[in-house]
C-alpha cells in the first residue's frame, strides 16, 4: 500500500469520527432549539434549525465519503464517486459555517469536516494518478 493510499485511509477514518461528532452535535441543536424557542426571536430559531439540518447533511455526506475513501484506499478502482462526494462535503461544510455564526461548536466541526474532505479529495486525485501510471 502506497503512502497516498495510507493517507487516504487515515483521512477517511478521521472523517468517520468527525461525521459522528457532527451528527451528535446537530442532534443536540435539534433537541435544544424547542426549549430556547420562547427566549429567542424567530430568525435566530430558524437559523439554528437550518444549521442543524445543514450539519446533519454534512454528517451523512461525510460518512458516505469516508466509506468510499476506505474502500478506495484498499482497492483504488473502487473509488467511484469519492471525489464528487468530497467536493459536496466541502461545499456543504462551508455553507453550514456561513449560516451558523451563533453556534460556534457546530461551525468548527463542520469546518473541520470540510477541511478533511478537501484533503481527502487531494489524496483521491493522487491515488487515481497512481493507477494511471
How would you describe each model-predicted region?
Residues 20-23, 94, 118:
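Hydrophobic residues within the alpha-helical transmembrane core of Major Facilitator Superfamily
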Residues 1-31, 43-46, 127-133:
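Cytosolic juxtamembrane helix and N-cap/initiation of the first transmembrane helix
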Residues 57-64, 112-120:
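Hydrophobic cores of alpha-helical transmembrane segments in multi-pass inner/ER membrane proteins
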Residues 61-89:
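Loop-to-transmembrane helix junctions at the membrane interface
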Residues 32-39:
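Peri-membrane helix termini and adjoining interfacial loops of integral membrane proteins
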Amino acid at each position: 500500500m502506497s503512502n497516498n493510499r495510507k493517507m487516504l485511509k487515515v483521512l477517511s477514518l478521521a472523517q468517520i469520527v468527525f461525521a459522528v461528532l457532527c451528527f451528535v452535535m446537530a442532534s443536540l441543536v435539534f433537541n435544544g432549539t424547542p426549549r430556547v424557542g420562547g427566549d429567542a426571536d424567530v430568525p435566530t430559531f430558524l437559523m439554528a434549525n437550518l444549521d442543524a439540518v445543514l450539519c446533519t447533511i454534512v454528517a451523512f455526506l461525510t460518512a458516505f465519503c469516508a466509506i468510499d475513501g476506505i474502500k478506495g484506499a484498499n482497492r483504488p478502482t473502487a473509488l467511484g464517486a469519492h471525489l464528487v462526494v468530497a467536493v459536496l462535503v466541502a461545499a456543504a461544510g462551508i455553507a453550514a459555517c456561513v449560516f451558523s455564526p451563533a453556534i460556534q461548536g457546530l461551525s468548527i466541526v463542520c469546518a473541520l469536516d470540510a477541511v478533511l474532505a478537501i484533503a481527502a479529495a487531494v489524496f483521491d486525485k493522487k491515488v487515481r494518478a497512481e493507477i494511471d501510471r
